[in-house]
Amino acid sequence: MSDVSKASLPKAIFLMGPTASGKTALAIELRKVLPVELISVDSALIYRGMDIGTAKPTASELKAAPHRLLDILDPAQAYSAADFRRDALAEMAEITAAGRIPLLVGGTMLYFKALLEGLSPLPSAEPEIRARIEQQAAEQGWDVLHRQLQDIDPVAAARIHPNDPQRLSRALEVFFISGKTLTELTQTSGDALPYQVHQFAIAPASRELLHQRIEQRFHQMLASGFEAEVRALFARGDLHTDLPSIRCVGYRQMWSYIEGEISYDEMVYRGVCATRQLAKRQVTWLRGWEGVRWLDSEKPDQARNEVLQVVGAIAN
């Protein structure tokens, strides 16, 4: 698409970054001075009743700056990147029609990628193939199937943990149905996003600072009642660790503690480590991201002003 064609498209802003980087605070500040409406891009914030462990914006923050695509699902439900793209496009169209600019804020990079580049259609599930995969897993174990996936699709295998049967089964199923790997299919883009997008990433200047913020925030969550929040989910009886909601960072570790699998101290250690690993993956995505402007979260006023310099002109 030519620069002239891009300039005629409606505007949108991406505010991306690793967990605990200050994205929400900056987005709320920007909403005070720009004609923007916020859309959450977070695979954990979609779930109702999961507030503390996801660092969901507080009631007062949401009153000042409402977020769309927040609290839209029960934790028993699944939600795909394709679901997100469909819902985000609808919200963006509504915001644009009202004469305002969509500001998409979050850290689920797969959602941002799906929205920006589109998705190639994946084959629908086939119960017979899924049953065959699950039978093999029951007989030989998921570790064997994970090694099988390593031979078929090493990129997907590196991303999918052997203890994640839902995603592991789906990756194998896609290959058995289509003859193409999940990686091949997801690298084939669909319809590109019909917006002129200004992309920003916010993070501390050093990894050590980010690690400190992550550890501090995890302890703040514990002090704010995170254990009670997960115990309430556990007590429902219909949730389990195969669900995407309970596999969220922090929740999986707290669930293991509640089930008696690990000690409290081990839960804290694993929770902090898992959050740091998530942040590392997010930063790795962003370092390879084209057209992104980096902001220093340790200098919030400067970060805000940098966004305003770029976006201010298009917002008037």
From Swiss-Prot:
User: One Pfam family of this protein, by short name?
Assistant: IPPT
Q: Where does ATP bind?
A: G17, P18, T19, A20, S21, G22, K23, T24
The protein's site described by Interaction with substrate tRNA is found at T108, R130
Q: Which domain of life is it from?
A: Bacteria
**Quick one: where's region Interaction with substrate tRNA?**
42-45, 166-170, 247-252
* Reactions catalysed according to its record: adenosine(37) in tRNA + dimethylallyl diphosphate = N(6)-dimethylallyladenosine(37) in tRNA + diphosphate
Q: Name one GO molecular function term.
A: tRNA dimethylallyltransferase activity
Keywords in alphabetical order? ATP-binding, Magnesium, Nucleotide-binding, Transferase, tRNA processing
List, in alphabetical order, the GO biological process terms annotated in this UniProt record.
Answer: tRNA modification
Q: Which NCBIfam families match?
A: miaA
Q: Return the similarity comment.
A: Belongs to the IPP transferase family.
Assembly and oligomerization: Monomer.
- Database matches in HAMAP family: IPP_trans
Q: What is this protein called?
A: tRNA dimethylallyltransferase
Organism listed in the record: Citrobacter koseri (strain ATCC BAA-895 / CDC 4225-83 / SGSC4696)
